[in-house]
């Protein structure tokens, strides 16, 4: 399970040793960092599976084959430098897929991993607020044209973003397929897609909406 981390730490050590003075000390820091990331990722995974967002999740013998591929993909995200919050979301997705009896469809996890692993905190905040707004609209039964954007934009402004920053952030998030741009209201706006609600059932996105 930790081979990717081992290889990544070794590569970092080789690069540092080649190009930087005081390399032996710095190489040790690189190795220690890789080991720290491995431990953190393992703790996050165990925490989410044992007592996380979906409660306790028990894996069965028939889960072994898909789980090997899924954990390998999770570990690749660790090796690629995914932040703690992103790794927690990925672990929640794994637990959610098991809970929803979708674990055998490994493509599902690969899709969500590709979306979540490198999102920034700002982008995650946009997703959290977007999901909360969609659920508020659904619960109120008041879905009208452009209602989603008319709620999302001021919510992000209240969080401290300028209109230009909001446009850039939403454009960035739209690459994931969770938001899509619309141009029928005089200016470019954004709308959530069904993927957002589906992801929200697997990972605690709404908790990210606080700022």
What are the roles of these predicted feature ranges?
Residues 1-2, 61-64, 99-102, 142:
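A short, ordered amphipathic alpha-helix with a cationic face
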Residues 87-211:
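Long, helix-rich, hydrophobic modules that act as membrane-proximal anchors or helical bundle/coiled-coil regulators
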Residues 1-48:
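Membrane-inserting effector segments that mediate pore formation, membrane fusion
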Residues 11, 25, 73, 111, ...:
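A general alpha-helix detector
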């Amino acid at each position: 399970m930790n081979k990717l981390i081992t290889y990544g730490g070794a590569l970092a050590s080789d690069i540092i040793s080649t190009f930087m003075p005081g390399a032996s000390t710095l190489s040790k820091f690189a190795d220690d960092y890789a080991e720290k990331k491995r431990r953190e990722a393992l703790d996050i995974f165990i925490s989410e599976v044992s007592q996380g967002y979906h409660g306790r999740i028990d894996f069965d013998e028939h889960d072994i084959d898909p789980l090997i591929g899924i954990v390998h993909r999770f570990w690749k995200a660790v090796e690629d430098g995914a932040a703690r919050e992103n790794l927690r979301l990925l672990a929640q997705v794994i637990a959610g897929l098991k809970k929803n009896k979708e674990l055998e469809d490994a493509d599902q996890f690969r899709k969500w991993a590709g979306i979540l692993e490198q999102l920034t905190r700002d982008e995650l905040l946009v997703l959290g607020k977007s999901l909360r707004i969609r659920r508020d609209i659904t619960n109120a039964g008041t879905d009208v044209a452009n209602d989603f954007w008319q709620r999302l934009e001021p919510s992000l402004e209240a969080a401290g973003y300028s209109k230009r920053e909001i446009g850039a952030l939403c454009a960035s998030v739209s690459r994931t397929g969770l938001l899509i741009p619309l141009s029928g209201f005089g200016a470019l706006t954004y709308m959530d897609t069904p993927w957002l609600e589906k992801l929200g059932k697997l990972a605690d996105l709404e908790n990210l909406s606080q700022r």
